[in-house]
Amino acid sequence: MLFKKDRKQETAYFSDSNGQQKNRIQLTNKHADVKKQLKMVRLGDAELYVLEQLQPLIQENIVNIVDAFYKNLDHESSLMDIINDHSSVDRLKQTLKRHIQEMFAGVIDDEFIEKRNRIASIHLRIGLLPKWYMGAFQELLLSMIDIYEASITNQQELLKAIKATTKILNLEQQLVLEAFQSEYNQTRDEQEEKKNLLHQKIQETSGSIANLFSETSRSVQELVDKSEGISQASKAGTVTSSTVEEKSIGGKKELEVQQKQMNKIDTSLVQIEKEMVKLDEIAQQIEKIFGIVTGIAEQTNLLSLNASIESARAGEHGKGFAVVANEVRKLSEDTKKTVSTVSELVNNTNTQINIVSKHIKDVNELVSESKEKMTQINRLFDEIVHSMKISKEQSGKIDVDLQAFLGGLQEVSRAVSHVAASVDSLVILTEE
């Protein structure tokens, strides 16, 4: 026991005075319920007077009361954690001292009630549970009873002190617990309102999400359909690339055949050009021969003329020789005519040779140009074939990628459908 009993004094502890007739309950109408609570616990002016008479005794032992109160809190570590998180033991001891002294002031007014409401609000805010609050208040009551037993020898007055103290502590607990409940109800109402708002938001959002997923599902399905179309087009493109590649290879082979033919023509033209050069040389030699023959004919004609002259001089004896000379002259003239005709033909032949040579040169140039163009076309076909191979490979890769993409889209479509079904279920739940 914290307090020693003093049995020496047997006189009355509470003096009779008009103080107990004082109007000690000074509450306005806003605390009408508190007035009813006071009546229920039988806490009136007489009891408040007793408390006022006990105040010096409480003040004398206030340190021991407060120390015992906080020592008792060691039984629950969470209480000390709350104290250390929001204040300190020393500060709270001073606060508790003032609070206890106010309980024994002998007056209950609006300020008294408001302070208790504020205390309850603080307790709720820092997370103090009602069970720990009530347990701690029981320690206060027991400490005060020990003080009374040690100081008040008159059993009736001791009982009066215990009753008054029990009633004021009971009122304290009622006020704090009511404030607890009020704060709790307010918090619960706020949470309920938030829950309703959240419920409404979830319902609205769920509906929006449901619509969104429905649209997404349609979009994904459209994308799947389009992807399938692209896949078919890609396959068709691969087939087309293969066909173009085959035709390009065939065209390249035909071009190579034509190029070989052009090479043969070019070789033949070169040979013809060489033969034409030889023919021109032969024609030039023939012209030289014609010159010689013409000279011989002219010499023969001159000899024939000389023979005719000599025959005329010879008279009758030279007639036979004149006939021969005349025939030789005719033969010479015929030879000259023939040579002239043949020379003209040779000249015409030379002209034709020159024309043909020019044509051959032109053809040769055309053949060279054609060969060059065929070479370029051949390179172009090589590039086309190479490009078609790359295109076919890329088309095949694209088709593989499209198939994988299509598979992924189908997975997404199934996932979207599953989520959409879940959202629909959520919408139904929120509507309930």
From Swiss-Prot:
Stated name of the protein: Heme-based aerotactic transducer HemAT
* Superkingdom, taxonomy of origin: Bacteria
Tell me which stretches of the chain form a coiled coil.
Answer: none
Q: List the disulfide bonds.
A: none
Gene3D superfamilies of this UniProt entry? Globins (1.10.490.10), Methyl-accepting chemotaxis protein (1.10.287.950)
Q: Which PANTHER family has this protein been placed in?
A: HEME-BASED AEROTACTIC TRANSDUCER HEMAT (PTHR32089:SF118), METHYL-ACCEPTING CHEMOTAXIS PROTEIN MCPB (PTHR32089)
Database matches in SUPFAM superfamilies: Globin-like (SSF46458), Methyl-accepting chemotaxis protein (MCP) signaling domain (SSF58104)
Query: Which keywords describe this protein according to UniProt?
Result: Heme, Iron, Metal-binding, Transducer
GO CC annotation, single: membrane
Kindly state a single biological-process term from the GO annotations of this entry: signal transduction
Record keyword Heme present: yes
List residues of the Methyl-accepting transducer domain: 184-420
